[in-house]
Amino acid sequence: MQVEVGQIVNTHGIKGEVKVKSNSDFTDTRFQPGEVLTVNHQNHEEQLTVLSYRVHKGFHMLKFEGINNINDVEQYKGDYLYQERDHEDIELAENEYYYSDIIGSTVFDNDNQPIGRVINIFETGANDVWVVKGEKEYLIPYIADVVKEIDIENKTIRITPMEGLLD
């Protein structure tokens, strides 16, 4: 199974580097040189091997083997990057989850009332924040005081909302 790890949002420079918006965790591992990513370009899967990786102004900058100029990489703008899930050899600590396990989960409050579905995750430094789409969009911090139970198998999450969190 493949998991989405980012989207190529633009080119950078003239030597074939791309600007990637990550929607994944463990980017330092996923994007390291030698890692193989899949791009689904015009309904055709292509394997791209990372040649170099760096972070620049909040974006992940990747260069792929065999792509040496802007013309070779321009075609991939807007395409999504994927990586094999079974390739994930990242050891998770207790209460750590892959983004792909959390995104798509339904969030419930203490009264078992659905709040919405996790549609995105972003890192703030101190903790992750989950974007939950329900009647409106909620930002749920992934902290022990709020997130009480995560059931990966059933894709459900139970939270105890702090005052004002769902206003």
From Swiss-Prot:
The keyword rRNA processing applies. GO terms for cellular component: cytoplasm; ribosome. Disulfide bonds: none annotated. It holds the Pfam family RimM. Coiled coil: none annotated. GO terms for molecular function: ribosome binding. InterPro entries: PRC_barrel-like_sf, PRC_RimM, RimM, RimM_N, RimM_N_sf, Transl_B-barrel_sf. The PRC barrel domain binds ribosomal protein uS19. An accessory protein needed during the final step in the assembly of 30S ribosomal subunit, possibly for assembly of the head region. Essential for efficient processing of 16S rRNA. May be needed both before and after RbfA during the maturation of 16S rRNA. It has affinity for free ribosomal 30S subunits but not for 70S ribosomes. This is Ribosome maturation factor RimM.
